[in-house]
Amino acid sequence: SVAVQLVKGIHSFSLLAIPFFILAGEIMGAGGISRRIIEFTNVLVGRVRGGLAQVNILASMFFGGISGSAIADVSSIGALLIPMMMDSGYDTDYAVDVTITSACQGLIIPPSHNMIIFAVSAGGVSVGQLFLGGMLPGVLLGMALMIISYVIAVKRGYPKGAKISFKEAIKIASSAILGLLTAVIIIGGVIGGVFTATESAAVACLYAFIVTFFIYREIPLSKMDEILLNALRTLATVLALLACCNAFGWFLAYLKIPALITGALLGVSNNKIVVLLLINLLLLALGTIMDMAPLIMITTPILMPVIQSIGMNPIQFGVMMVLNLAIGLCTPPVGAVLFVGCTIGKISMEKLTKSLFPFYAAMLAVLMLVTFVPEVVLFIPNLLLK
């Protein structure tokens, strides 16, 4: 029955990682970690032309590795850096473009709760391998965005950042290191076999709590009520979507829709390149009109037989799917990250979309690498999990 499928949709041990990662992200976002990451990345890349854009992208890479959420990234990093960039002479469209596209790194750089959703939807794909598989594509995405940002910054004549003394740099790095260690603990623990991906989420949550309230101490413990409420709101939305999408997936399977779509795609061509391009086009189109979590739940059972028939590794497919749908989050008409960025920057979606095309090109280039060069995804999992 439908009720049974609704319950089955959220009755999974792997899904326990999601509330812990959401809560860890909320705690560290509220406790000053985003500001410290910005200061730390400014030490690393702030002095180049358009330095604040490079800081924005690198900060998103680090923060995404903690929160695993693009919206959390834009809300915290963007709320600080978009006004800062505008005050420093950067155009509003450029500041928002850099922020929303770089936020997509958090969806593929571990930990990503969307990877966990894919793992469950795909029927037990290793979450640890998915986490490791997303590392190199996430870094490549960041590098591609940094190159595009630098080219535009030089063309528009944006300023360089101020020089930071060695003594000040050491002070900033030592202040940020505890927050950055969250991602190291998660990935290191999974690789070393100390704990599973689900257990790592609980450890990350406890570590975030200790660092925020007993070491950084920027906010009082009484703020925990608000943090828990925000995490609960996010979790309620995610779990409701998962439950309903599982029931929907059951209906699709009952009606043999996956088999029909597999036949339709392979009927166009049995060439692997053509089939992969068609799947990418399908996911990109769907990503512009639907949110990521339900799309993963709906499309994974449909497309997995197609992927298996052409011999693609499920880990590679998972990273490819999440990156596709991440692009959709900053694409109109229903890009959640795009909406948040426009709200912070006080700019219309129509004006912003025109200036986004060079950034879309960079993201699509990385997507093509992920799709057609398996080692981009599989190199690190094969190296570390032999």
Predicted regions and their residues:
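Alpha-helical transmembrane segments of multi-pass membrane transport proteins
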Residues: 1-386
